Amino acid sequence: MPFRHLYVFGSTVAQSERLMLGGACDLVWDKGQVGLGDLTLPWGPQHEMILFGMYVPSKQNREDGRGALSARLRAGSVLRVDRPNSRGVKAHPTEKPVELMRRLVESSSGIDDVVLDMFAGSGSTLVAAILSGRKAIGAEVAAEHYETALARCVAAEGLWRAGQEAY
């Protein structure tokens, strides 16, 4: 079933009306530490909003990616995952942690499904998809980020294959 679920970082349900989604909710990514934001304010941003949109309800089991609906599908709307280190270690200015993207990928797709990221950046979503047994398709306009994402995907594919051979 194509286009089951959609995630948009920095967007909210209030901004999603034109998408005509079958269902939507706001998720909050708790980054675990305060960011810079507006330094004139006494409060610093520690979170990022994520719009979750659903076109068609999924009936796949979230325990192993196959079968009937399981309780794992329903989770809290606050995702607590530390953001990548900002001291020159990040591969992209808005890089997302693979663990965060893995949670989203596994919640919204099954084994062998295709995960599409039209703004791949450093490839975190694609890596999460590969490591979760999904097929990954990504697009990135910046050549340097494309190269980074490609290298990360190749490495993830090797890790995934090695893990499969261990079973």
Model-derived regions: residue spans:
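Conserved SAM-binding loop
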Residues: A149-L150
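Class I S-adenosyl-L-methionine-dependent methyltransferase module
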Residues: V154-Y167
